[in-house]
């Protein structure tokens, strides 16, 4: 937010200067241009975070497409137990996918934005992605819950739920984004409240209108534990790697400053220091990329081990996924 704060301060100074000089109209135009630049910068950072936020929801298409025919087929055979089992498997698979993605975006929001969008202001874009990461869990779970309700014949209920959630989103954006202390951060907060409300209503409806309702504790507990531990591992690895990279950068800068003390004129000294600073900057960018990718890779391994160790998934669950049988054989389920 440093650049944006400077722009706002410049707008205030321009307005004050215009008032003292009598050029209020010119100052107002300058303030308008500066504020428009700030708003575009804010929306640009938010749009970049949205691009990453939308990726996990696209993975839900395969699950939602398989839930409706599987549940409808079981109900047509009057197999209510089978329909309930398929519904529970769909929710469990979704939780196993959505929880780690949401936790990963929440924990690694800033380094991911720095890796993919280095030109953006990471102090602004990072927290936006982290907040949107929490909304990812609610969106993915809501999509599958809607499919379950539709498979049981309750076609209109998901629409009503979405209308209620949309009202919450509009209310939050209108009132919270306008708060100076919240600003653009109110937009992802609106996503959390909107889709969190939709998911809560969907789960209540599933429990009320569907026979043999799924046991939510059995479905969500193990994915939540595995995701929480995975997030802790990613946070620890990235934190340790960042400290190592900062130590190396500090040593490189000290070496550059030491070389600048040698005789050779002021120009040579400044040149040596400039080369050292560029070396530190390159090391920072490369180090962030390596540390971020390494933390994500270790998090994936930790999560996979925990899912198998906790028995968080079964062969019936994998049957809803593409190549589920091969994955089950690989995991020896």
Describe the role of every protein-language-model region:
Residues 52, 92-100, 134-138, 225-233:
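Hydrophobic alpha-helical transmembrane segments of multipass membrane transporters and ion channels
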Residues 211, 238-333:
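Membrane-proximal transmembrane or re-entrant/amphipathic helices at the cytosolic face
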Residues 49, 60-79, 84-87, 91, ...:
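Helix-loop junctions and terminal segments of transmembrane helices
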Residues 30-32, 42-60, 91-96:
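Alpha-helical transmembrane segments of polytopic membrane transporters and translocases
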